[in-house]
């Protein structure tokens, strides 16, 4: 069975930096899948020029479209035309054809993976159109945040240089997320994010406040609590 490293090995034109970038991408792309409520596929062309699924990412926030392992699968011939067009694009490329995966109607969007002036492959965002019906504020904010991260891929801005997944016990989208303005003001906080801050002792509302100031309030509250705790002499 083909795996990620073996598939990349079919491309001798990829240098170490190219491979490292792709490994970094699949280490960090879970957040995009979760925010977007969508499956992600990384496609690269193998030594024969065929588009192959090099890696896949299932969302943890919605039922996956891909219960089976599709790594190593060759993309069908009827998709080659739009895949070639997406590879030549400098921005996100949207398919004009709805496809069927299982029993779901799916819209494909392609993000060319750009790095050091080269297009290494495509990240396919497979969206089940049924998940776009009757979305509320939470879903809309989540999808928009995922879209912004996804659109950074062709610009070479995602993944970040410093890995997001390097920490142990990393929080996931389902634990809550916060949307900030360019100035660092909270524009939206997911319900679970608000609950986390409440448990830490935050009493004010979050939207409209600088996140840094909210954090400072919590630090001051913790410091005050420590100062007022009775001290026990060591025996």
Model-derived regions: residue spans:
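PAS-family sensory domains
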Residues: 45-81, 141-146, 159, 165-227
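Sensory/regulatory domains in signal-transduction proteins
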Residues: 78-141, 195-196, 200-212, 217-227
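Single conserved hydrophobic/aromatic residue that forms the stacking wall/gate
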Residues: 226-235
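Non-catalytic regulatory/interaction regions at protein termini and inter-domain linkers
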Residues: 1-77, 89, 98-101
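PAS-family sensory modules
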Residues: 2-36, 129-176, 220-224
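Hydrophobic beta-strand positions
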Residues: 42, 112-113, 179
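Conserved beta-strand and immediately adjacent loop positions that scaffold enzyme active sites
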Residues: 39, 109-110, 176
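Secondary-structure boundary/capping signal
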Residues: 40, 201-205, 233
